[in-house]
Amino acid sequence: TFTYETDWGFRFDTSLRWQSNRTVGNLHYYRVSDGEEIRKIRTTDASVGLNYNPGVTYVNTKQQRLPINLDSPEISLRHTMGLDGFMGGQYQSNLTTLGIYKRQWLGSFGYMDFNIVGKAQWSKVPFTMLIQPPVNLSIFEQEATISMMKDWEFLSDRQLFWSVAWDMN
């Protein structure tokens, strides 16, 4: 992973990821064309991301870096490309993500957080590489997620997700 960040809120990052997933238990993948079982799925991904967050300030701790000014708007654009044949990658994929975040203060009525995320999978990929909605599987509330929904319930190649959270202080 390489990250370049400026003082005025612009960040550019790029990364290369390789992973290999095997099926376990009663889960089996079969190719539709010939019925052959696929025992392992290997992917190699290259990502490029742009992020613009003007006016953000951070606090550095020993283990992490936390933003303390959540009032600034954030716009992010990321493209992830699956590389077929490179380092064992078996599938070509192209996933583009565009996200917008903004916090709006309402005076003595608290504040509202607005999140909008759009994703598009441009290539024909296996169902395990399709887009999943942000599902909250825990018993704790998490912002910008959907509760009371099962994992892997709605897979698609296009997604537009928005959420509004109102904290009344």
PLM regions and their residue ranges:
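Exposed, low-structure sequence patches enriched in small/polar residues
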Residues: T1-N169
